[in-house]
Each structure stands twice: as C-alpha cells, then as structure tokens.
C-alpha cells in the first residue's frame, strides 16, 4: 500500500533511502507486477534494524508472501519461522532464499497462520504480523507467550491506507479490516504485556516491546 505520509515528506524520505540490492529490487518488481502484497522497503528495513538491535536469534512471521521481509531478517543471522498459504508464493520465496544463501535459516509453514501455530514452538525474539488483518488479535495473543521478555512485535498496515483514522473521525469503517484495526490498535497500545505505539511509518506500523 502507498505511504500515508504527506507527499513532500514521503518524497523526501524516499530520496534519502539507500538503494535496494539487485535481488530485493527484483522481488519488489515481482510483487508489483503480480499485485502481491509485501512489506514496504521502509518496514522491511525497520524489521532488519530491530532484529539487529535485539540480537534476535529467532523470528516469527505471519505472512511470507514471496519472502521479501523474511530474507532481510534472515540476512542478520536470525532464524525465521514464517507462514503462507499460497503455493506459488512459497515456491518463489524459496527460490529467492536459495539465491540469497539464507534458505537454511527460513522455515516456511504452508498452511493458514492460526493452524501453523499449533506446530510452532518458541521462544522468539521478534514477531511480525502481516497476514489476514482480521486475525491480528489472535496472532498477537497466541504469539505473545512465545515472545521473550524484551522481544518486539511489529504490526504492518495498522492504519490501512488511511482508512483507520478516517473511520475514527466518521464512525463509519470502510470495510471489515478497518473495523478490526480500530479495535486492534486501541488494544495493542494498551496491552498489559506490552509497551507499544502505532506510528505513521509507511501504511501505519505498530511496534511493541514485551514487558517483564
């Protein structure tokens, strides 16, 4: 989704952004060509930075797509356990991971995220929510017990292309995802197990740190 920041701000930030390497640019073009939702360059960079900052050994990702953010976190040396239901996207993710020499650090569960959790064990240092938007509350509650104290949760699309603040102002959510995010965001920033915030990074990015 496009950035929700004002045009001049978004253009400036884009102008100082380091260029992506050839593989990531190829993945971005693939996602754009086939309308595959992947994390933005900014959010994937944020994930990579957080993996480094927390010295993450293991990450849990809801929504592999073609592995764009998965690979960037794996590049830090972190093992990534990730979920995806689309076989073609999984095949692409595996091919890209092989080419990037990080396939041995990526474990893809080919099934719905909530089902995959039945076979996933913690602990994790980083959790990334980017699959079915209406399922975010369940992703959060089921992954938190597996997240170590001081571990980080990253939530993608938290402002849903500006629809969430618009719905907050009008009281009229545009769709089911918007309605779900209104409730999720309020609960996320007030969650007793987290120190959390929702930021305007890209399409809205939630960041939470697990308390003791």
Q: Each predicted region: which residue ranges?
A:
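N-terminal auxiliary segments of SAM/dcSAM-dependent transferases
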Residues: 1-21
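A residue-level signal for beta-strand positions that form part of recognition/binding surfaces
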Residues: 10, 24, 205
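Short, basic/glycine-rich phosphate-binding loops at helix/coil junctions
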Residues: 24-30, 164
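Conserved SAM-binding loop and adjacent beta-strand
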Residues: 17-19, 32-46, 52
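S-adenosylmethionine/decaboxylated-SAM
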Residues: 41-212
């Amino acid at each position: 989704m496009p950035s929700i920041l004002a045009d001049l701000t978004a253009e400036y930030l884009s102008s100082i952004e380091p260029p992506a390497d050839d593989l990531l640019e190829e993945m971005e073009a693939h996602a754009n060509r086939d309308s595959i939702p992947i994390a933005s360059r900014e959010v994937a960079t944020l994930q990579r930075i957080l993996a480094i900052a927390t010295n993450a050994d293991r990450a849990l990702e809801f929504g592999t797509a073609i592995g764009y953010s998965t690979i960037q976190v794996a590049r830090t040396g972190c093992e990534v356990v990730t979920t995806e239901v689309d076989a073609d996207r999984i095949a692409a993710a595996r091919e890209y991971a092989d080419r990037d020499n990080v396939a041995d650090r990526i474990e893809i569960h080919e099934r719905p995220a909530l089902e995959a959790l039945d076979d996933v064990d913690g602990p994790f240092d980083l959790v990334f929510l980017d699959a079915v938007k209406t399922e975010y509350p369940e992703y959060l509650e089921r992954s938190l017990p597996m997240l170590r104290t001081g571990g980080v949760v990253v939530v993608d699309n938290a402002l849903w292309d500006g629809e969430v603040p618009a719905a907050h102002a009008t009281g009229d959510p545009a769709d089911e995802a918007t309605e779900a995010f209104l409730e999720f965001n309020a609960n996320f920033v007030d969650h007793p197990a987290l120190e959390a915030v929702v930021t305007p990074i890209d399409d809205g990015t939630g960041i939470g740190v697990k308390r003791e």
